[in-house]
Amino acid sequence: MGRSPCCEKAHTNKGAWTKEEDDRLVAYIRAHGEGCWRSLPKAAGLLRCGKSCRLRWINYLRPDLKRGNFTEEEDELIIKLHSLLGNKWSLIAGRLPGRTDNEIKNYWNTHIRRKLLSRGIDPTTHRSINDGTASQDQVTTISFSNANSKEEDTKHKVAVDIMIKEENSPVQERCPDLNLDLKISPPCQQQINYHQENLKTGGRNGSSTLCFVCRLGIQNSKDCSCSDGVGN
């Protein structure tokens, strides 16, 4: 079950307050205090809801309210408090005795905002409008600079990766591997035929002929059959 309304809408007055209603509300509060706003209208003989009585008392009828226009000192104090607190009008009103939050809010929107704009100050940030434009341009320039720097870093990283890959990859040799294994094997058929031919001619070609054993690299062998006796 929800909370019951503060008053019956069918039995309450709406609209502007009359002087008679103001006098009744002031007389009751002076005699009994504020008390409970929900029960105050009926006790004071008013056909108003509790919320309407409370706002009427706080904003218009309480004796400590300051009447008249805001002073220059109050304007500067409101500007300073707004730069610190923002749109917290109740807290700002607590620093200005005799002024209500609703009164200060209306005065801000109708007067102080225009005053700040005429000074070239942003009412929201309390900074110079020109400084805000310059700051935005500076941020844009910095963002382009960062983009160029990132692009250069990317190119440098790619180049370094390529160099590292080339260093780690095996170098292909220009010449094939040479088989240096030496083996003693029978001579091919061409060498045998050549040796037999020399034996038949008896080395008459006019040049010294080595036998088969000497051709194998065996020096001073008893099996040497060179015609000039080189092996011996």
From Swiss-Prot:
InterPro entries linked to this entry: Homeodomain-like_sf, Myb_dom, Myb_TF_plants, SANT/Myb
GO function terms (MF aspect): DNA binding
HTH myb-type domain span: 9-61, 62-116
Compartment list: Nucleus
Intrachain disulfide bonds: none
Feature: DNA-binding region: 37-61, 89-112
Tissue expression per record: Expressed in roots, stems, leaves, seed pods and flowers.
Gene Ontology CC entries for this record: nucleus
Keywords: DNA-binding, Nucleus, Repeat, Transcription, Transcription regulation
PANTHER family: F14D16.11-RELATED (PTHR47994:SF5)
Function: Transcription factor.
Protein name: Myb-related protein 308
Source species: Antirrhinum majus
Lineage: Eukaryota, Viridiplantae, Streptophyta, Embryophyta, Tracheophyta
